[in-house]
């Protein structure tokens, strides 16, 4: 069986963040919580989410692989209100996931499931020379600046600085976060540099994977030269991890 009760607002944020990159996913359910990983259709980005049982108000789960249409689930979850309880209930016989919103009124939806098994995708264990922790709001603003210039951006770590750089045929954009300057707002919360590095990425993907963040969310970004960028952040105890392949420059 599988049945879980949680806060609608937090679950909505996790689903929105995941569905920005993939259309369908397999929830791996067991007694410890929910896990899922999937590649985007172009195999450029990987998304992984983990919701331990502790983030739920009530949780009962046996081992199940639940293949779900994320776009359908996202539309249903969007109908939920922040003060409503969200109840997820697996109907094995009918092969459906029941989604119930409960307050003084009870609303129930059912989603047909895909007959799929877990892809066993895992986030690869890569050793990165550099990592930074930065407020999502500041990172997103730098992406907006870069978008004015090009559809690709370069993430650089050099001389105690984290740099977001974009160059077009005529124009360029650069945002520099200097670890050596005192920052009362702590925009750059952590900076660990092992070596200078630079990698270039598709801007649209970076926008998608940060679209559901709040300004004060802390992004942990792992970087190395011509390596995939790994971005992690948490939503009320749930963990989201994104891996994006670099654009290899000739």
From Swiss-Prot:
One Pfam entry name: PCNA_N
Molecular function terms, GO-annotated: DNA binding; DNA polymerase processivity factor activity
InterPro entries noted in UniProt: DNA_clamp_sf (IPR046938), Pr_cel_nuc_antig (IPR000730), Pr_cel_nuc_antig_C (IPR022649), Pr_cel_nuc_antig_CS (IPR022659), Pr_cel_nuc_antig_N (IPR022648)
One GO BP: regulation of DNA replication
Residue ranges the record marks as coiled coil: none
Keywords: DNA replication, DNA-binding
Record text on subunit structure and interactions: Homotrimer. The subunits circularize to form a toroid; DNA passes through its center. Replication factor C (RFC) is required to load the toroid on the DNA.
NCBIfam families in the record: pcna, PRK01115.1-2, PRK01115.1-5
Function: Sliding clamp subunit that acts as a moving platform for DNA processing. Responsible for tethering the catalytic subunit of DNA polymerase and other proteins to DNA during high-speed replication.
HAMAP family: DNApol_clamp_arch
PANTHER family: PROLIFERATING CELL NUCLEAR ANTIGEN (PTHR11352:SF0)
Family membership noted in the UniProt record: Belongs to the PCNA family.
Protein name listed in UniProt: DNA polymerase sliding clamp
Organism this protein belongs to: Methanococcus maripaludis (strain C6 / ATCC BAA-1332)
